[in-house]
């Protein structure tokens, strides 16, 4: 029998005595009664850390798990910080989620806690990709936003990403300040649960068209697309939230011959057809590549579950598909964008791009050859968004990205956008 730190027993017992549901109490009691204490220890040896990117962890009962209570406690901390930052303003936040197990429950919990604190919620009626949350924050003038997702992690995981009013993930000083507020919430009983449904306003499907109209403005080659509109393109959302929006974006660009992998088209948080829902891994693209060969596709695309990253595969001279790595894709996008901007007389010497320090230096060299500034930032797309915000009114942002398949073209979104990147 494993010896258990008394502090772990005390924490589990305090959860038992708190205002949680009976099912969770029964699960905790079962952990306490079990002769194998490993699950008890892992569930309660610490609090699930709210880091600079929010929460991420395995779902289950306990302080070190993603559940309605850890989500609620994080939301209470974020709500407290928003109320401190904007004491005399009507605060609103945007919320959505991807396909993962419990995502509707966690998103509902987030919305309820915000409204219980007098904060208005703009709530997507259906799951939508991460970039649409970022766009919604900016479009509706929200002060913050929450995306419930664990990106490409295994099915056992879930997460909670916090955004600020510019549409980017929170950065200094807000990230550290939010963490401080969340750490003050030490019990489920510290959460205000008295929800106010009148403060929830649903974002309807017509918002999709507003977003797609912005995506359409990114098109730089309408004539070329018209001439090749029947080019076969295969797309897989890998059971995620981009299954509707990527085909729609490709269509507004002018592409008509789009084949979606049927077995991976429906949202499913168990990701039954892949080991990991990560487009960086060739295994996750097996079905998409098979369909690509079947329809003689010129391009095979796939997004991760929350639709912020994408992968591209192209056929070689033998008809076999090659998965481009993030540096290759980023370099191609950079050269294409700058070539078209120069061709259309849009380069004035005040344009810039941004990439991360681990991304290929080839992108910087391409930018230099076009006379375009290329800023290099620390890893994390929030740092790219921070530069875009800092340069507003001074320079014009064209695009940027990181080698882990994250790209952003245009500045109407302030996080990785796999939907618009697929179109480009």
Language model regions located:
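Conserved phosphate/anionic-ligand binding catalytic regions in large, soluble enzymes, centered on
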Residues: 44-64, 150-153, 233, 237-249, ...
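Short acidic, glycine/serine/threonine-rich loops at helix termini
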Residues: 104-109, 134-138, 156-162, 183, ...
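Gly/Ser/Thr-enriched, mixed-charge loops and adjacent short helices
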Residues: 15, 19, 39-43, 47-48, ...
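Proline/glycine-rich low-complexity loops and linkers
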Residues: 125, 185-207, 316-399, 407-408
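Glycine-rich phosphate-binding loop
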Residues: 143-151, 155-157, 162, 288-319, ...
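An N-terminal, well-structured beta->alpha segment
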Residues: 3-110, 201-230, 241
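N-terminal small/polar loop signature for handling phosphorylated ligands or for N-terminal nucleophile
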Residues: 94-157, 256-312
């Amino acid at each position: 029998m494993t010896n258990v730190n008394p502090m772990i027993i005390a924490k589990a017992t305090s959860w038992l005595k708190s205002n949680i549901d009976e099912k969770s109490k029964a699960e905790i009691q079962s952990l306490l009664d079990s002769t194998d204490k490993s699950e008890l220890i892992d569930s309660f040896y610490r609090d699930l850390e709210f880091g600079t990117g929010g929460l991420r962890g395995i779902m289950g009962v306990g302080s070190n798990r993603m559940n309605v209570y850890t989500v609620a406690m994080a939301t209470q901390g974020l709500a407290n910080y928003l109320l401190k930052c904007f004491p005399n303003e009507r605060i609103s936040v945007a919320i959505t989620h991807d396909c993962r197990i419990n995502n509707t429950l966690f998103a509902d919990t987030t919305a309820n806690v915000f409204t219980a604190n007098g904060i208005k919620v703009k709530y997507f009626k259906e799951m939508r990709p991460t970039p649409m949350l970022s766009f919604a924050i900016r479009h509706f003038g929200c002060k913050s936003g929450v995306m419930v997702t664990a990106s490409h992690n295994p099915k056992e995981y879930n997460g909670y990403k916090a955004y600020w009013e510019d549409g980017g993930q929170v950065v200094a000083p807000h990230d550290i300040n939010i963490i401080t507020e969340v750490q003050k919430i030490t019990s489920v009983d510290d959460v205000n649960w008295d929800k106010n449904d009148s403060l929830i306003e649903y974002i309807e499907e017509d918002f999709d068209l507003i977003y797609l109209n912005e995506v359409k403005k990114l098109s730089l080659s309408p004539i070329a697309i018209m001439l090749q509109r029947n080019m076969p393109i295969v797309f897989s959302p890998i059971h995620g939230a981009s299954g509707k929006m990527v085909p729609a974006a490709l269509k507004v660009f002018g592409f008509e011959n789009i084949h979606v992998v049927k077995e991976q088209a429906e949202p499913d948080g168990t990701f039954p057809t892949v080991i990991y829902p990560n487009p960086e891994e060739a295994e996750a693209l097996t079905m998409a590549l098979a369909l690509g060969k079947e329809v003689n596709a010129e391009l095979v695309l796939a997004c991760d579950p929350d639709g912020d990253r994408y992968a591209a595969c192209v056929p070689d001279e033998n008809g076999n598909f090659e998965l481009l790595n993030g540096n290759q894709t980023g370099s191609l996008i950079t050269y294409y964008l700058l070539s078209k901007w120069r061709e259309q007389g849009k380069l004035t010497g005040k344009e810039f791009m941004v990439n991360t320090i681990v991304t290929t230096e080839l992108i910087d060299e391409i930018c230099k050859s076009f006379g375009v500034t290329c800023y290099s930032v620390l890893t994390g797309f929030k740092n790219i968004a921070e530069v875009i915000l800092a340069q507003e009114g001074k320079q014009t942002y064209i695009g940027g990205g990181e080698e882990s398949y994250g790209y952003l073209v245009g500045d109407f979104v302030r996080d990785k956008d796999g939907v618009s990147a697929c179109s480009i």
